[in-house]
Amino acid sequence: MTNIRKTHPLMKIVNDTFVDLPTPSNISSWWNFGSLLGLCLITQILTGLFLAMHYTPDTTTAFSSVTHICRDVNYGWIIRYLHANGASMFFICLYAHMGRGLYYGSYAFRETWNIGVILLFTVMATAFVGYVLPWGQMSFWGATVITNLLSAIPYIGTTLVEWIWGGFSVDKATLTRFFAFHFILPFIILALAMVHLIFLHETGSNNPTGIPSDMDKIPFHPYYTVKDILGALLLILTLLMLTLFAPDLLGDPDNYTPANPLSTPAHIKPEWYFLFAYAILRSIPNKLGGVLALLLSILILALIPMLHTSKQRSMMFRPFSQFLFWVLVADLLTLTWIGGQPVEHPYVIVGQFASILYFLLILVLMPATSLIENKLMKW
């Protein structure tokens, strides 16, 4: 008798995804982050659901409802902080996952990569609208500053901003719709993640060498289920350490002050995971130019498959490209640091140099280096 796991229409899908999936035998721990992102998403949806049961999306009660969750709801404090720090873990895994894709040439799977870029935008949108919900000072002013960027669009900008706000400023209508968006977007992310997997399983996973591995595949279970469980345990440990010992480490103290439209905080800045893009935005002394640079800093990822000039897929055997990859990582860390600093000398000039280097590396230096490496290999 054939195993039900292989015949039942639903079980068959699960089996082909998590059990009998042929997987390259040499993929490293950098391939763990896909499953960790799935774990993060499920954690965020569950904690978010329980938070939504007690939260009120109204300007007069939003801040106090979050306080109520932390003080009066059974284990509300841990649910709230798991959700807030879970977002940080989500972005750590997301950036590691993208870095892996860049390093090993996984972007050659065009459809999978493009869905991934759309997923990144969706996750960023979800995190942004979610940050507005506690209705603290940084929530309010962050929403005001970022939505205001759309007013840089010629002709329709101002109308567009007021349409998004639902009025002439960030107010009750804005908070209500942001809550609605924050509730629906994770489910859209879930659907997109499934499409992401469908496209990945059309081609099979890449591996560190970038060489086709069809002749050397092993079943996903038990080899990679066990390997993924180790990664999951490390992720859970890190999240719990952060939540239980330093829950406010990555947050902004300003967000413990209720939103006040009459008092602007000294330094308006987003959460750490948006600082690199914020630094690029601020490095251009023109509103429309800054907004375009901000958009391009992420949209540029969609161009990466077209910018691949090397005859090898992975960077495993390309030392010069490896060097530039780590320069890019250092550059992004520099931008993240600059994004959190006030707009004054020397931070402004460092941010401008780092922004130029970011685009230069991706658009010019890395493709050119790949061509040089091709020549060195006598190809």
From Swiss-Prot:
Gene Ontology MF: a single term: metal ion binding
Q: Does the keyword Iron apply?
A: yes
Q: How does it sit in the membrane?
A: Multi-pass membrane protein
What UniProt keywords are attached to this protein's entry? Electron transport, Heme, Iron, Membrane, Metal-binding, Mitochondrion, Mitochondrion inner membrane, Respiratory chain, Transmembrane, Transmembrane helix, Transport, Ubiquinone
Task: Kindly indicate whether the keyword Iron belongs to this entry.
Answer: yes
Q: Which residues bind heme b b566?
A: H97, H196
What does UniProt give as GO cellular component? Answer: mitochondrial inner membrane; respiratory chain complex III
Q: Which residues cross the membrane?
A: 33-53, 77-98, 113-133, 178-198, 226-246, 288-308, 320-340, 347-367
Instruction: Copy out the cofactor comment.
Output: Binds 2 heme b groups non-covalently.
Protein's cellular compartments: Mitochondrion inner membrane
Which residues of the sequence carry a binding annotation for a ubiquinone?
H201
Q: Which InterPro entries match?
A: Cyt_b/b6_C, Cyt_b/b6_C_sf, Cyt_b/b6_N, Cytb/b6-like_sf, Cytochrome_b, Cytochrome_b_C_euk/bac, Cytochrome_b_N_euk/bac, Di-haem_cyt_TM
Entries under Pfam families matching the protein? Cytochrom_B_C, Cytochrome_B
Chief location: mitochondrion
Ligand binding (heme b b562): H83, H182
Q: Which cofactor does it need?
A: heme b
Q: Which GO biological process categories is it annotated with? A: mitochondrial electron transport, ubiquinol to cytochrome c
The text of the family note is: Belongs to the cytochrome b family.
More details: Heme 1 (or BL or b562) is low-potential and absorbs at about 562 nm, and heme 2 (or BH or b566) is high-potential and absorbs at about 566 nm.
Self-association and partners: The cytochrome bc1 complex contains 11 subunits: 3 respiratory subunits (MT-CYB, CYC1 and UQCRFS1), 2 core proteins (UQCRC1 and UQCRC2) and 6 low-molecular weight proteins (UQCRH/QCR6, UQCRB/QCR7, UQCRQ/QCR8, UQCR10/QCR9, UQCR11/QCR10 and a cleavage product of UQCRFS1). This cytochrome bc1 complex then forms a dimer.
Q: What does this protein do?
A: Component of the ubiquinol-cytochrome c reductase complex (complex III or cytochrome b-c1 complex) that is part of the mitochondrial respiratory chain. The b-c1 complex mediates electron transfer from ubiquinol to cytochrome c. Contributes to the generation of a proton gradient across the mitochondrial membrane that is then used for ATP synthesis.
**Name of the protein described by the UniProt record:** Cytochrome b
Please name the taxonomic classification of the source.
Eukaryota, Metazoa, Chordata, Craniata, Vertebrata
